[in-house]
Amino acid sequence: MIKIYNTLTGHLDEFKPLKENEVSMYVCGPTVYNYIHIGNARPAIFFDTVRRYLEYRGYKVNYVQNFTDVDDKMINKANIENVSIKEIAERYIKAYFEDTSKINLKEEGMIRPKATENINEMIEIIQSLVDKGYAYESNGDVYFEVKKYRDGYGELSKQNIEDLESGARIDVNEIKRDALDFALWKASKPNEPSWDSPWGKGRPGWHIECSAMSRKYLGDSFDIHGGGLDLIFPHHENEMAQSKCGCGGTFAKYWMHNGYININGEKMSKSSGSFVLLRDILKYFEGRVIRLFVLGSHYRKPMEFSDTELNQTKSSLERIENTLKRIKELDRENIKGIDDCQELLATKKEMEAKFIEAMNEDFNTAQALGHIFELVKAVNKTLDEANISKKGLEVIDEVYSYLVMIIQDVLGVQLKLEVEVNNISADLIELILELRRNAREEKNWALSDKIRDRLLELGIKIKDGKDKTTWTM
């Protein structure tokens, strides 16, 4: 049974998707006015892992993550550079895919809508809110009237309207009826992109964008809505309010929010100037190391970014890979031990169950990784004893396949498992041996012997068997 910490209820809820064996999930994507930083990469990596795990457990996952390609930050960026907002969006969407390809996000089957491609869907929801009395037009702007949703507003962020009112600043322009009201549609201004609407030319507010895109691709009610902690209020609170009032569904059933990545003890953010771009980190650390670093902490807990932490993660990944390479390097033709590896098999089954148990408990990747390292330790112990039987080798191979599947397919951490001998890859050696076999079949003994002797000079000894040629160091 999978349990999810639901921000809406404030506790762990049993996960029961709306449709049997199918999960609908929407995660707020980036506003594409700059390159993404490591803090932006955290939700991308985590929710990609949620998707992978749910698929591993047999669910079909409909996963939507948007691009916000029109808002104040993008307009400011375009004006500063004296280019179109479309040019800014295209540049940074391209950069987003360049950067995230290194952290192995699963793009297959992914839906990535752009806000500007869904303006009509936004207008439809806004019109519904106006018709139902939850929104009003003022000088070409349209606002959601928060007090009309007094009983529901603040449910997600655990705030009440009275407290929000006391903390709200007084609006100078007096266009809004109340300081708490938020924009659904903004009247056109010079040097800003605009679209036709029943209220005149203008552009959408930020919050309505996600409501429209989640509705278009997942419906009025769906399973999981994800994003960073900083989005709970006002973004997600406003999303939920306008969607419930305008569309009539329950909107998201489970709300998941990841914690911040801090740098020098402060939340990483572009607005504060305290951030490190993902593409800059990728100059020094591989994307798979960054991905494992993110998964090494529970998603709701804050993380501290540092080179020290990344170097430790790199060492941990190398420990896994070195163990798996040891299995690949086994001299399989000379396995003569008596250990059937039943103890290792029992450990594998135990760790397999514990991995699922950890992931079922609110996707605890940190704990799940701990169980993986326990299994890696058990494998090394078995290999160190060097007493494996032929039957034991089958167990070793089963453990190998399981570890590769869990780490690469479920956690999404790519492994480098090519064995190298004196900087020559195992695959290259096999190719050379294939060429030698061809030479022998053609009775080109001189070439066959030359390949054998040259490999020996490199420290690689080959042995011709009846049906197969093997090699060892």
Curated annotation (Swiss-Prot):
Cofactor, how bound (note): Binds 1 zinc ion per subunit.
Enzyme class: ligase
UniProt motif ('KMSKS' region) ranges: 267-271
EC assignment: 6.1.1.16
GO BP term, pick one: cysteinyl-tRNA aminoacylation
Binding site for Zn(2+): 28, 210, 235, 239
GO molecular function: ATP binding; cysteine-tRNA ligase activity; zinc ion binding
Motif 'HIGH' region: chain residues: 30-40
Entry coiled-coil feature ranges: none
Residues annotated as binding ATP: 270
Superkingdom of this protein's organism: Bacteria
InterPro entries, per the entry: Cys-tRNA-ligase (IPR015803), Cys-tRNA-synt_Ia_DALR (IPR015273), Cys-tRNA/MSH_ligase (IPR024909), CysS_C (IPR056411), Rossmann-like_a/b/a_fold (IPR014729), tRNA-synt_1_cat_dom (IPR032678), tRNAsynth_Ia_anticodon-bd (IPR009080)
Compartment(s): Cytoplasm
Cofactor entry: Zn(2+)
Reactions the enzyme catalyzes: tRNA(Cys) + L-cysteine + ATP = L-cysteinyl-tRNA(Cys) + AMP + diphosphate
GO CC terms, sorted: cytoplasm; cytosol
Description of how the protein assembles with itself and partners: Monomer.
Family per similarity comment: Belongs to the class-I aminoacyl-tRNA synthetase family.
Name recorded for this polypeptide: Cysteine--tRNA ligase
Organism: Fusobacterium nucleatum subsp. nucleatum (strain ATCC 25586 / DSM 15643 / BCRC 10681 / CIP 101130 / JCM 8532 / KCTC 2640 / LMG 13131 / VPI 4355)
